From Swiss-Prot:
It comes from the Eukaryota. Residues 23-116 form a propeptide. This is Endoprotease bli-4. Ca(2+) 1 binds at D124, D211, L252, N255, Q257, G259. It is an enzyme of class 3 (hydrolase). Residues 491-629 form the P/Homo B domain. Residues 1-22 form the signal peptide. In larvae and adults, expressed in all hypodermal cells, vulva and ventral nerve cords. Substrate binds at residues 203, 238-239, 283, 300-305, 311, 339-342, 353, 355, 415. Belongs to the peptidase S8 family. Furin subfamily. It comes from Caenorhabditis elegans. Disruption phenotype: RNAi-mediated knockdown causes an arrest at the L1 developmental stage. RNAi-mediated knockdown in ASEL neuron results in a severe reduction in Ca(2+) signal in ASEL neuron and in chemotaxis in response to high salt concentrations.
Length: 942
């Protein structure tokens, strides 16, 4: 009996540990085990903006509102008495949650965020200047000031007289080999960032600095930490980071102060948000500030660069990013520039940083004065380009302004790289203000210069002939080339997404032991449904892996063109034993390639511990791109065979006969000649797609003709859907659709209701906010945010835990609502719950039935039981579990030290022998299952 209790206790403890640590981001805590920090504020969301209602709700709960709302309808609430007990505060929040006007409420906890510079002894030149904080209101005068037309472009006289300009080696050929970022070529065409607004998200900026004051933009500035409009940082000796970044972008030129900013005529603002506790809501409020006014947001911070953290933006920050690219700048999209990270000395990777792996950001790396990688550089395939920065104290760093009112030549790290990139991007926006956020990503990577950095190892040529590196992206940003290409750039076609989910053969999840290598292949043919992606932009891999030491894992992706991207290198400092859950790894290295063909994901371990165990669960390939070339001069890929045959048969049909419903007989008409390419059989007007006798490909109804006219097209335009050989109009609330009233994508930042399995909802409708019972999903599809049924956030085999993240169901459950066997909705294969109410193993066929197993030969009546009963029973079970766990915790260390080997019943998978290159298949004999999803190869051959 003692042995049985001990075994049960250990099983319970294992479940509790799994529940506690199965999380998406390392910063997400589990309050049930006391792992959370004290909440710093509470956020509520109302149905629409109503400041007076928000204040009344707060007052009724002995709280108060601070600052302006963010994301339109979200408000910061603070408890009136900070000495209240935690239990009292929680009770207030629970009452808030039940208020009929409150759609959502959450206590916000601090997240660890660090500035991406490092400390050198500053040789600063300080000027006497008062360092003050005063509130500056945003008024109509300020707004009108920015809207006034600027004077014509003036060609500056170089070199500038500013005293430290001579030390800005990265701007005038001062790097080894005479290299720089070719900014002077843009300046000499008169571009200096006019009419472009840049906001520095950081610890604030000194708005009255003599080298910034004339360019200061109050509409691009605020204080989220203290909830006022003045971004001036506290003068405590530490808060100089944001001011330094601002000076790199827009320090004045020709005023004999410090050096010059890259975009010295741009408007510069700052958000004070790092000078206090940082939460998801603080980040969201910063990222969503005045998105129609601000053009570029520059951020030189992120999760800890310690080599052991996986973390990224929370749900509110992700929504802010999404709204920015959808609605910002009048629908052209805000441009988010991010520093790639300073964890190189700890062998960190920016692939573990959810800000740099966001599709919406331009991740910027660094290079040194002598064109090498700096010691702090992090590698990842999401880095798009590089600027110069610092190395060590023996080499020159970056010149900029400093607080209070001085200058420095010691600005460092990738913190210095992101603002330089933002300034150069501002030059391109002045040259072409119509550029979208995706246009800018195209331009930056197409014009980047890899030649100054070519002597660094790791460069490779991708499938379209561009050189790319995990260290430097596509190379140094080239200001002159960027501006020149921007001037003639045409807006890229709409971005689409294709999703391919890998189906893992049994055993699922797949046990992994020791040093292993798994190779999974996916065959891609454009898109299984919807608009095809033939010209790649971003590539994402969402993967779930559990392993004893997360830092021993390595993930590599191979495209059909042979481009190899190391999505995750080994990180020796990362001893996390929980792996990662659906982490969005990003690569921009396949940009421009044709995605069709076989993709291969290699998952391997570099461990030296043969007893290291884990499980591989799932992976999904997300391909972002367009159906047409981005620019007219780009290579044109052939259409898929299936599509070509379909189009060909349609042409033959139109050529051979006229539809019965056609109101005219085409042979009776005389063709005008020189018909449009889409015409078939003649036309009544030359070169007009609306005057054809018949169409080669598709007939599209004209919206402005009330549906009575048509034009011939090769494919349906946006706001139309394909029905046979006709393009019919979508409903006016759709951007694209699959049927007239079933939207596929929505205009602006509207949310798409995607609940086809729940017909009582308006599936396919575009809405401003999700109806009750549905939740907004900004993560699964970055092209179109959706309203989904809450369970769909995770999928089969997972449930939503207490902190809103996906956790694994118990192994006995195929689907579940909570942890443990008591919460199964449907039992796994080989389990049943027909007689006892929870899933347990089926009795062997022909064996004597006993209380230890389930008679699975009988139908399961519990499938019809109300889920509320099951949930209540499950709650009782977990109360008992907690008591047993508390009793068994004392023996935890002793038992753990005695338990050395794995208790996984599956035979070990293939292991790679690094000494002789052999692949050891161990005792695995089920070759048929292996062939379904794995091809074991010698990595030296690959």
């Amino acid at each position: 009996m003692r042995i049985s209790i001990g075994r049960i206790a250990w099983q319970i403890l294992a479940v509790l540990i799994a529940v506690a640590f199965t999380i998406e981001h390392d910063s997400i805590c589990d309050e049930s085990i006391g792992a959370c920090g004290e909440p710093i504020h509470t956020v509520i969301r109302l149905a629409k903006r109503d400041d007076e209602l928000a204040r009344r709700i707060a007052a009724d709960h002995d709280m108060h509102v601070k600052g302006d709302p963010f994301l339109d309808t979200h408000y910061f609430l603070y408890h009136s008495e900070t000495t209240r007990t935690r239990r009292h505060k929680r009770a207030i929040v629970e009452r808030l949650d039940s208020h009929p006007a409150v759609e959502w409420v959450e206590e916000q906890r601090p997240k660890k965020r660090v500035k991406r510079d490092y400390i050198l002894l500053d040789n600063d030149v300080h000027h006497s200047n008062p360092f003050r904080r005063s509130v500056l209101n945003r008024d109509g005068t300020r707004r009108a000031q920015r809207q006034q037309p600027q004077s014509p472009r003036e060609i500056p006289s170089l070199p500038f007289p500013d005293p430290l300009y001579k030390d800005q080696w990265y701007l005038h050929g001062g790097a080894v080999g005479g290299y720089d970022m070719n900014v002077r070529q843009a300046w000499l065409q008169g571009y200096a960032g006019r009419n472009v607004s840049v906001s520095i998200l950081d610890d604030g900026i000194q708005r009255d600095h003599p080298d910034l004051a004339a360019n200061y933009d109050p509409l691009a500035s605020t204080d989220i930490n203290d909830h006022d409009d003045d971004p001036t940082p506290q003068n405590n000796g530490d808060n100089k980071h944001g001011t330094r970044c601002a000076g790199e972008v827009a320090a004045l030129a020709g005023n004999n102060q410090c050096g010059v900013g890259v975009a010295f005529k741009a408007k510069i603002g700052g958000v004070r948000m790092l000078d206090g506790a940082v939460s998801d809501s603080v980040e969201a409020a910063s990222l969503s500030l005045n998105q129609d006014h601000i053009d570029i947001y520059s951020a030189s911070w992120g999760p800890e660069d310690d080599g052991k953290t996986f973390d990224g933006p929370g749900p509110l920050a992700r929504e802010a990013f999404y709204r920015g690219i959808k609605n910002g700048r009048g629908g052209k999209g805000n441009i988010f520039v991010w520093a790639s990270g300073n964890g190189g000395s700890r062998q960190d990777s920016c692939s573990a940083d959810g800000y740099t792996t966001s599709v919406y950001t331009l991740s910027i790396s660094s290079a040194t004065y002598d064109n090498h990688r700096p010691w702090y550089l992090e590698e990842c395939p999401s880095s798009i380009a590089t600027t110069y920065s610092s190395a060590d104290f023996r080499q020159p760093a970056i010149v900029t302004v400093d607080v209070p009112g001085g200058c420095t030549d010691k600005h460092t790290g990738t913190s210095a790289s992101a603002p330089l990139a933002a300034g150069i991007i501002a030059l391109a926006l002045e040259a072409n203000p119509e550029l979208t956020w995706r246009d800018m990503q195209h331009l930056v990577l197409r014009t980047a210069n890899w030649k100054p950095l070519e002597n660094n190892p790791g460069w490779s040529r991708n499938g379209v002939g561009r050189m790319v590196s995990n260290k430097f992206g596509y190379g140094l940003i080239d200001g002159g080339a960027l501006v020149n290409m921007a001037k003639t750039w045409k807006t890229v076609p709409e971005q689409h997404i294709c999703t391919y989910e890998y189906r893992l053969a049994n055993p699922n999840p797949r046990p992994i032991v020791g040093r292993f290598q798994l190779n999974f292949t996916l065959d891609v043919n454009g898109c299984e449904s919807g608009t095809p992606v033939l010209y790649l932009e971003h590539v994402q891999v969402h993967a779930t892996v559990r392993y004893l030491k997360r830092g021993d894992l390595k993930l590599t992706l191979f495209s059909p063109s042979g481009t190899r991207s190391v999505l995750l290198p080994p990180r020796p400092q990362d001893f996390n034993a929980n792996g990662f859950h659906k982490w969005p790894f990003l690569s921009v290295q396949q940009w421009g390639e044709d995605p069709r063909g076989t993709w291969l994901l290699m998952v391997e371990s570099v461990t030296t511990n043969p007893a290291a165990t884990g499980t591989f669960h799932d992976w999904t390939l997300l391909l972002y791109g367009t159906a047409d070339p981005a620019q007219s001069g780009d290579p044109v890929y052939s259409a898929t065979p299936a599509t070509s045959q379909g189009v060909l048969s349609r042409v033959h049909q139109l050529t051979s006969q006229v539809e019965e419903s056609a109101p005219i007989s085409f042979p009776d008409l005389t063709s005008a000649g020189n018909c449009h390419d889409e015409c078939n059989g003649g036309c009544t007007e030359s070169s007009s797609a609306t005057s054809c006798f018949a169409c080669k490909h598709l007939t599209q109804t004209l919206r402005n003709k009330g549906g009575s006219g048509f034009k011939c097209v090769q494919k349906c335009d946006d706001t139309y859907y394909l029905d046979g050989d006709k393009c019919k109009m979508c409903s006016s609330h759709c951007h694209t659709c699959t049927k007239a009233e079933v939207c596929e994508t929505c205009p602006g930042s509207l949310l798409l209701i995607d609940v086809d399995n729940m017909p009582h909802y308006d599936h396919g409708k575009c809405v401003e906010s999700c109806p009750p019972g549905l939740v907004a999903d900004y993560e699964s599809n970055l092209v179109q945010a959706k309203c989904i049924w809450r369970k769909d956030l995770c999928g089969d085999g997972y449930y939503i835990n207490a902190v809103g993240k996906c956790d694994l169901c118990d192994s006995s459950c195929e689907t579940c609502t909570a942890p443990g066997p008591m919460s199964c909705e449907k039992c796994s294969k080989g389990y049943g719950k027909g007689s006892i109410g929870y899933c347990r193993p089926c009795c062997p066929e022909g064996s004597t039935k006993s209380w230890q197993c389930e008679d699975c030969s009988k139908p399961d009546p519990t499938l019809l039981i109300d889920s509320n009963k099951s949930s209540g029973f499950g709650l009782m079970f977990w109360i008992v579990v907690s008591l047993i766990a508390a009793c068994g915790i004392c023996a935890c260390k002793k038992c753990a030290s005695e338990t050395k080997s794995s208790n996984v019943e599956y035979a070990p998978l293939a292991q790679y022998n690094a000494t002789n290159g052999a692949i050891n298949l161990g005792a695995h004999t089920d070759d048929e299952d292996d062939d379904e999803d794995e091809v074991f190869v010698n990595p030296q051959i690959v």
